[in-house]
């Protein structure tokens, strides 16, 4: 842009421009505003919220078709939502959960389905224990510095699972565990990245659990309120339908241009969008090579979120809570949770279509997807009432051009160790937020808040308002949602793996011994 072409920026000058009006960008803007910093938030969509989105209509009152869940140890989002006057409620797991595998339904209670096969039990136990132990070796703020980083980053999670698991039962559930947690396939993701991801969410039990875990609660009225209320506080500082296309930081201030040719001048910029979406922006000067390479190598996960509404919560007649873990290649849905309103109205089941299945099911008409889901629920829950919904909502995040997918970006093999260290590294006066840059609960709303507030403090430090030592701040535990420590029994800590047991004793002796041990701890029926 020549001097003759420079736009008139009268009334368009700000201290900090924020790209992205999701929770991360708005959390950053809110914190900066509290320091009397003049901010501008540019959001590409016609709404705020990013990967959180609360739909409102007469059929559902409100429903979260994007990010929704919060729980213990997610203290930043709990603090922010409380400050905004948004209450939480517990997701219902009072009744039994069910596992559907090999065409049969098995009710259970707890975080993970029980395992009746002695060797499979040993295999499961070793899987969770090994993943957690490996995760503890990985620094949450610098996973590329882990002692085995190079080795683990060359492996896919499929490679690692196949190496750890001895039984097909444990192996297939482990594949599903990857699908559910990061909406991608085990062969697509780096073992180092996935182990880090689970670790920074508190471990295998915390990330997968409802009670005392990442899915314990939702917001009354929907998670979209977090962004909507911050937008209300910021007023006209939030510009919707303003995709950023150009950033020029060659002069004293940064020039930001949007798709509709609006121009703004800022001292600093915070990018709070998924890394791969910054490839839609033209930068002057060009991004450093490592940053440019990184953003081309972080694809987004794939998910369709589906809510089926019923006249009544018929599943409770069988003492089921609505949570289903479904292991069936032909089934569209992999996992469900009760999505009934906290007052018991509008009974609903939320289900995720994940990874490869999201691509497959997206090719079908919405009505066919709905029918297939209802038929699946009828089969798993053993009730024809599942065939007669009163309403259906869904959101295919793969078709969102300003998200690219959900829940989060993932690291394929080799990328974390080669380029991961630049994910939060500023480029000149451009800083980076977004849940992908977090070190606790990355991929969740909690990670979005952590990243946004950290990036805001980096800018405040550059402005001389915050000391460098105060950029990273520990968050006090929520008094309203305290965490319960996750512990493991002596046997869980010390039982051998299947190969370990077979190495010590003969096969027949091993099976007999294991059956006796499991009988004693009441893992097997009398």
Swiss-Prot record:
Q: Which UniProt keywords apply?
A: Acetylation, Catecholamine metabolism, FAD, Flavoprotein, Membrane, Mitochondrion, Mitochondrion outer membrane, Neurotransmitter degradation, Oxidoreductase, Phosphoprotein, Transmembrane, Transmembrane helix
> What catalytic activity does the UniProt entry give for this protein?
a secondary aliphatic amine + O2 + H2O = a primary amine + an aldehyde + H2O2; a primary methyl amine + O2 + H2O = an aldehyde + H2O2 + NH4(+); (R)-adrenaline + O2 + H2O = (R)-3,4-dihydroxymandelaldehyde + methylamine + H2O2; dopamine + O2 + H2O = 3,4-dihydroxyphenylacetaldehyde + H2O2 + NH4(+)
Catalytic activity, EC: 1.4.3.21, 1.4.3.4
Pfam families named among the record's database cross-references: Amino_oxidase
Has keyword rRNA-binding?
no
Q: Where found, per UniProt?
A: Mitochondrion outer membrane
Residue segments, region Interaction with membrane phospholipid headgroups: 520-522
Modified residues annotated as S-8alpha-FAD cysteine in this record: 406
What's the main place this protein lives?
A: mitochondrion
Membrane-side (Mitochondrial intermembrane) residue stretches: 519-526
Record flagged with keyword Phosphoprotein: yes
- Ranges that cross the membrane: 498-518
Q: Where is this site: Important for catalytic activity?
A: 374
Cite a single GO BP annotation.
serotonin metabolic process
The subunit field of the Swiss-Prot or TrEMBL record says: Monomer, homo- or heterodimer (containing two subunits of similar size). Each subunit contains a covalently bound flavin. Enzymatically active as monomer.
Q: What does this protein do?
A: Catalyzes the oxidative deamination of primary and some secondary amine such as neurotransmitters, with concomitant reduction of oxygen to hydrogen peroxide and has important functions in the metabolism of neuroactive and vasoactive amines in the central nervous system and peripheral tissues. Preferentially oxidizes serotonin. Also catalyzes the oxidative deamination of kynuramine to 3-(2-aminophenyl)-3-oxopropanal that can spontaneously condense to 4-hydroxyquinoline.
What's the protein called, per UniProt? Amine oxidase [flavin-containing] A
**Per UniProt, what is the name of the gene that codes for the protein in this document?**
Maoa
């Amino acid at each position: 842009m020549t001097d003759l072409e420079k736009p008139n920026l009268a009334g368009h000058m700000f201290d900090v421009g924020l790209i992205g009006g999701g929770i991360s960008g708005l959390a950053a803007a809110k914190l900066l505003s509290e320091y009397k910093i003049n901010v501008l938030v540019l959001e590409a969509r016609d709404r705020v919220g990013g990967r959180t989105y609360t739909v409102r209509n007469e059929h559902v009152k409100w429903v979260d078709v994007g990010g929704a869940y919060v729980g213990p140890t997610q203290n930043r989002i709990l603090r922010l939502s409380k400050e905004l006057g948004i209450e939480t409620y517990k997701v219902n797991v009072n009744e039994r959960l069910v596992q559907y595998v090999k065409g049969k339904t098995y009710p259970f209670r707890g975080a993970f389905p029980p395992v009746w096969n002695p060797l499979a039990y040993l295999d499961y136990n070793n899987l969770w224990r090994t993943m957690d132990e490996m995760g503890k070796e990985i620094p949450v703020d610098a996973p590329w510095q882990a002692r085995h980083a190079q080795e683990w980053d060359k492996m896919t999670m499929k490679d690692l699972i196949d190496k750890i698991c001895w039984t097909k039962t444990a192996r297939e559930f482990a594949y599903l565990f990857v699908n559910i947690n990061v909406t991608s396939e085990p062969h697509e993701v780096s073992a180092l990245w996935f182990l880090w991801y689970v670790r920074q969410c508190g471990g295998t039990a915390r990330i997968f659990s409802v009670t005392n875990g990442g899915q314990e609660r939702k917001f009354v009225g929907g998670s979209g309120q977090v962004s909507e209320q911050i937008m209300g506080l910021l007023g006209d500082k939030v510009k919707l339908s303003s995709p950023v296309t150009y950033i020029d930081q060659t002069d004293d201030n940064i020039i930001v241009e949007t798709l509709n040719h609006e121009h703004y001048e800022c001292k600093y910029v915070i990018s709070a969008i998924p890394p791969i979406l910054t490839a839609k922006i033209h930068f002057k000067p060009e991004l450093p090579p490592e940053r440019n390479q990184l953003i081309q190598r972080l694809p987004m996960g794939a998910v369709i979120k589906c809510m089926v509404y019923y006249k009544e919560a018929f599943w409770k007649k069988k003492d089921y809570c609505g949570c289903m873990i479904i292991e069936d290649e032909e089934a569209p849905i992999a996992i469900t949770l009760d999505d009934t309103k906290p007052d018991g109205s509008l009974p609903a089941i939320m289900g995720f279509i994940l990874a490869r299945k999201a691509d497959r099911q997206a090719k079908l008409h919405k009505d066919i997807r709905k029918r297939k889901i209802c038929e699946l629920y009828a089969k798993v829950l053993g009730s024809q009432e599942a065939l007669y919904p009163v309403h259906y909502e869904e959101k295919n995040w793969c078709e969102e051009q300003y998200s690219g997918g959900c829940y989060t970006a993932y690291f394929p093999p080799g990328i974390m160790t080669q380029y991961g260290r630049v994910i939060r590294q500023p480029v000149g006066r451009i800083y980076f937020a977004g849940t992908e840059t977090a070190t606790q609960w990355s991929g969740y709303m909690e990670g979005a808040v952590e990243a946004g507030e950290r990036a805001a403090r980096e800018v405040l430090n550059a402005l001389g308002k915050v000391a460098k030592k105060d950029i990273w701040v520990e968050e006090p535990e929520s008094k309203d949602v305290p965490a319960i420590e996750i512990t493991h029994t002596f046997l869980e800590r010390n039982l051998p793996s299947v190969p370990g047991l077979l190495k010590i004793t003969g096969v027949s002796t091993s099976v007999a011994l294991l059956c006796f041990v499991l009988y004693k701890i009441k893992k097997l029926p009398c």
